[in-house]
Amino acid sequence: MSKGNILFILYGILTLTLCGGDAFHLIPRVIRAFKGSSDRIKKQLGIGLQVSSITMTAFYILLLYIWKFTFYEMKAPVALEMVIWLSALVRIVICFLPQNNWCSDEGNRKLSIIRNAVFAVTGIGVIILYALSGNTYGYHMTRMVAAILISFGCYLPVTLLSKKMPKIGLLMIPKTCAYIWVIVMGLQLLFAAAC
């Protein structure tokens, strides 16, 4: 299988992971913002948050492998790759803990801070990789760094404040737009490789 085919498959999986994961929490957030909350919406949002927390972690692991196949002549520092993998696995394990209380109003602030701090480590690791590659092959991957920074800039306030200020959850929309930008960059790379 050629490098182009592998990248095409990885970007396809990345897109499905993004769309599937975000749909689980965006739809209940939009409904809650316009119609108010109910027990049903709270449960849907709680499950959606858990699912999207796991899928977004997988999203960053996929970005790691996309980087490796795009910049195949570059080697990711072993320590950095280990940090990305370890932090991602720790976050996924934390996401499965019932103590998260995903479907309750209270949640678990301590676990939320821990799992999102670990997620930030994963994201920073991926940011470093794309910053290292920069404009290699004329791909302008510094834009990937910008997209990830925007997504975290929108995600963190929602994580910290959405229980007290539900409408801040609408910041997940620009976060999703930043991730769509990641997908568009992938399509541009694939079309450039095909030419």
Q: Where in the sequence are the language-model features?
A:
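Membrane-helix boundary/juxtamembrane motif in polytopic membrane proteins
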Residues: 106-117, 130-146, 166-173
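Transmembrane helix-loop-helix
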Residues: 7-11, 71-85, 132-147
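Short juxtamembrane and helix-loop transition motifs at transmembrane-helix boundaries
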Residues: 38-47, 73-79, 101-110, 132-138, ...
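Alpha-helical transmembrane segments in multipass membrane proteins, preferentially the mid-helix core
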Residues: 1, 65, 92-101, 117-139, ...
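Lipid-exposed faces of alpha-helical membrane segments in multi-pass integral membrane proteins
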Residues: 13, 17-20, 24-27, 51, ...
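Early transmembrane hairpin module of multi-pass membrane proteins
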Residues: 3-79, 170-173, 180
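Juxtamembrane boundary at the C-terminal end of a transmembrane helix
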Residues: 184-195
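Membrane-proximal helix-loop-helix units in multi-pass membrane proteins
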Residues: 54-126
